[in-house]
Amino acid sequence: MFRDSAKIYVKAGNGGNGMVSFHREKYIAAGGPDGGDGGKGGDVIFVVDEGLNTLIDFRYKKNFKAEPGQDGGTSNRSGKNGEDLIIKVPLGTVVKDELTDMVLVDLIKPGQTCVIAKGGRGGKGNQHFATPTRQVPNFAKSGDLGEEYSLILEMKMIADVGLVGYPNVGKSTILSMVSAAKPKIANYHFTTLVPNLGVVQIEHGKSFVIADIPGLIEGAHEGVGLGHQFLRHVERTKLLVHVVDVSGVEGRDAVEDFDTINSELQKYNQVLSTRPQIVAANKMDIPGAEENYKAFKEELEKRGYKVFGISAATNKGLKELLYAVSETLKTLPDTILLDETQNEEVVYKVQEEKPFEIHIEDGVYVIEGKWLRKVLGSTNITNYESLQYFQRALKKKGVITALEEMGIQEGDTVRIYDTEFDYTR
């Protein structure tokens, strides 16, 4: 089964907690703090595996969690770091944040790796909190939480050439005749429901990869006829071979078919309207096709297109078509065209968040902020010294000032995620 999209959840490992301990040794009455640091949580890492060609594995496993770091030990011993979790994905996988729909990474290189979720830092042991005035720190920091995301994976095939056109115009037959690929072929619409890849060998060792894109229809850019799923794969190709049925047996006009498909490509992604095209007028073996072909070729050559009359069923004209494709590919950049505007460097940036937000809910001051979750997670709220450390962090970030400007009073309740505090000056 082919699968070109999936939704998964990833969670990096939490950092291990710092240790609270004091040096104990015979004849040493006042051993200092020697609590070790917690280990770092494991990262979640995507790795491109060229042996994969579908996202089907993510149909059965959707939740991925890396190993947490171990807690620190006595005698300044640090906890062991958690192991990274490696997730293998096919070449051409696009990773999106489900919440924002923002592209996080586009995996287009063999062996490419990407840390998609970073493990939490290990908490500091109490050895780090000794000062001249606090020689016996009775607290340590908890480990930071590992990053977690709900992700959308989309696979976009990578090929040199894409065969596009209406359903049942002969794209799969062409692929089967020019390569070793064995796509499903039948005389009805949407026989091909998944993209198929084939390698075309030209003499003297020259070759290129060609993809049979399932048939497109009017409204494909809006998802009609599974259009979104099919058009996704066209974006990766450097050259399009636009296959048109000139036999007239379907009762459609060949020029109108050509214009309709190009309109759908343009509406889906403006970049596709500028993608080079070679036109293959197929089914020339059917009576009446020759006359239709002459008018069709004349019109498209006026527009500057190269047009080849072929019959995929009899092999007529395929050799000439393939040589034209091979020669055209030589003139095109040897790079993968991405989803974004051509000739423009794509930089993915995480949206900047406000340091914190405060709102009042049923008389309770609710404070939210990504860094707050981390700081609170690393605080031992049952320890007075650790709480003091947390309060200083809030004051430094301006949270206390913001609360006072909102009119908070002594004894009012403050909630930070799942933890509530009474406000005191």
Curated annotation (Swiss-Prot):
User: Which residues belong to any copy of the Obg domain?
Assistant: 1-158
The top EC class is hydrolase
| UniProt: GTP binding residues | 165-172, 190-194, 212-215, 282-285, 311-313
Q: Which UniProt key words apply to this protein?
A: Cytoplasm, GTP-binding, Hydrolase, Magnesium, Metal-binding, Nucleotide-binding
The cofactor required is: Mg(2+)
EC annotation? 3.6.5.-
In which residues is Mg(2+) bound? S172, T192
**Please, which domain of life does this record's source organism belong to?**
Bacteria
GO BP annotations, alphabetical order: ribosome biogenesis
Q: Where in this chain does the record put each OBG-type G domain? A: 159-330
Q: Name one GO cellular component term.
A: cytoplasm
The compartments listed are: Cytoplasm
GO molecular function (one): GTP binding
Q: Which InterPro entries match?
A: G_OBG, GTP-bd, GTP-bd_Obg/CgtA, GTP-bd_prot_GTP1/OBG_C_sf, GTP1-OBG_CS, GTP1_OBG_dom, GTP1_OBG_dom_sf, OBG_GTPase
Q: What does this protein do?
A: An essential GTPase which binds GTP, GDP and possibly (p)ppGpp with moderate affinity, with high nucleotide exchange rates and a fairly low GTP hydrolysis rate. Plays a role in control of the cell cycle, stress response, ribosome biogenesis and in those bacteria that undergo differentiation, in morphogenesis control.
The Swiss-Prot or TrEMBL record describes its family as follows:
Belongs to the TRAFAC class OBG-HflX-like GTPase superfamily. OBG GTPase family.
**Subunit structure, per the record?**
Monomer.
**What is the protein's name according to its record?**
GTPase Obg
What is the originating organism of this protein?
Answer: Ruminiclostridium cellulolyticum (strain ATCC 35319 / DSM 5812 / JCM 6584 / H10) (Clostridium cellulolyticum)
Q: Name the gene for this chain.
A: obg
